[in-house]
Amino acid sequence: MLKGIAASAGVSVAKVYKLETPKVVIEKKAGVAQEEVKKFEDALEKTKKDIEGVKERAAKRLSDEELAVFDAHLMMAGDPELAGQIKAMIENDGVNAEYATEQVANQMVEMFESMDNDYFRERAADIKDVTFRLKCNLLGLTIPDLTSIAEDSIIVAHDLTPSDTAQLNEFVKGFATEIGGKTSHSAIMANSLEIPAVVGCPGVCDACKTGDTLALDALDGVVEINPDEETIAKYEAKAAAYLKEKEELKVLKNEKSVTTDGHEVELAGNIGGFKDVEGVLTNGGEGVGLFRTEFLYMDSDHFPTEDEQFEAYKQVLEGMQGKKVVVRTLDIGGDKHLSYYEFPQEMNPFLGYRAIRLCLKETDIFKTQLRALCRASVYGRLCIMFPMIATIKEFRDAKAIFEEVKAELIAEGVAVSDSIEVGMMVEIPAAAVLADQFAKYADFFSIGTNDLIQYSMAADRMSEHVSYLYQPYNPSVLRLVANTIKGAHEHGKWVGMCGAMAGEPHAVPILLGLGLDEFSMSATQILKARKVVKSLSYEEMQGLAQECLNKDTADEVLETVKTKLGE
C-alpha cells in the first residue's frame, strides 16, 4: 500500500496504464546555421499547432478557467524572447537546434525557479512542458496519445502535464502520480472532469507496470497494487457507496438551502465563462457568486472590445435564467498576465499593480468593461464587484466611474437596468477591519478567502516552506470574516464568500453560524454543501461559531467543529 494526496475524489479499480514519456537525449553537434534555424522554426510551428489541437480537444470537457493554462503555453511558444535566444545560440555558436533549445530552456527554467514569485515559478513548469514538446518535434519523437486509451485504465506517471490531463477520455478511471499537490494543474483538471486522482505518491511508478491491477482510493489518498480479491471487493464496495452518495445528492438539486430551523442561505457557483453556466445549473446553483472576467482577456490577443465583452456577459446573464450573477471586474496582475500588456517589474506583484489599482489608472480599459456590463444588465440580474479594494477612496472612485459610464449610456439612449448592485471583494485585511465603514457605500461584500488568508498570515500558500501557515480555520481569519459580516449586516447589506473556504464541509457550519448569506464555490461542491446546510440548526451553529472565534489555534477550531458534527 502506498500513501499519497487525495486530489480529486473517487474510488476505482482498473488495469494500470503506465505513461512512458519519450526519453529525450540531446547531443551537441555542429550545424549549418540556416538549416538549423529552419528546422527550429518548423518544429516551433508544429508545437504551436499541437498545443492548439490539445486545447481544442480539451475545450469540450474543461472550463474556460482550466483552459487558460494552454493560453499560457501558446504565449510561451510564441514568445519572441525564447525563440530569439535559441536562434541566436544556433547562429553564434554553430550548434544544432536541439542542443540550443535545451540549453536556453534549462537557463530559463533555472532562472524562473530561483525567483521568489509564484507566477514566475509556475512559468518554469510551462517552459518545461512547451520545450519538451518542442524537443520531441525536433527529434521526431512521438508523445504518447492518451486519447487512444480504449479500455478501463488507471494512469500511473511521474507527473501529468496539463496537456496530458486534457487528453483523458472516458476510459481513464483515475490516475496516480509521484509528484504534485491539490493545487497542481492536473489535480484541478481532474476535479473538473470528476476523475479520481492521487498525487504526491512517491514510488508508485517503480512499484507497478502496465497491465497490473491497481486500486485507487482518492478519498483517503491510498494506492494498492495487485490487491487480492477480498481487497478488490472492499474498494469496489467503497466506490459503490461513494457513487450512491453522489446520486443521493442529486435529489437536492431543486431544493432550497435551508437549515433545520428555517434559516435560508444561497449556494452559488464560481465560473470563468458561459461554458461553466451549465455546470452551475446542473448542480442546483442558485446563482453565480463569482464570474472571473479575466479569462475574456487572457483568452484573447488584444483587449476585448466593448461589443465582444457585451456578448459574453449577455450570454451568461441569459444562461442563468434570471438568477443572480456577480461579476468581478478585471482582476489581472499578480499571477495573471496578458501577452499584449506590459506590467511593471515588481519585487512582489501580488502586493503591487493589479486588479482595481490597474483599472483606476487605465480608466479606458475599465470604462470599456463597465459599458459592456451596463449594456448587458437588462438581460438578467447583474451585480458588479471590484477586486482588491483596500481603501474607501478606491471604492468611491471606482463607483464614480461606474455611475459616469451608466449616465453616459442612458444619455446615448441605451437601456441600462436600474437595479444593478455594486459591491466589492473583501480580500485585504484593511477592508475586513473597516467593513462597517465600507458598508455605507457598497451594496454587498464578497469575501475572497484565498487572498485574505495569505495577506492575514503573511504566507504564500504555494510555498511548501510556509504552506503550514495557510490556515483557513485560524481564529484571526475567522474574526476578520465575522467582522466583515457584522459590519455589512449593521447596514442591511448582504455578504457572500467566493474563496475555496466557502465549499469546505467543516467551514460551512462556522460560516453559517457567523451569518454568511451566500456561499459561492466550484459547481461540483454545491450539492454536498446543501446537504450539510440542511442537516444543521442555525441557532446551534451560531453558538458553535462564537466558540470557534474564542479558540487559540486552527487545530482547536477544526477539532471543535468535528466534535459538534459527531465525527
Outline where the language-model segments fall:
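Non-catalytic, soluble scaffold/interaction modules
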Residues: 1-302, 308-319, 325-332, 362, ...
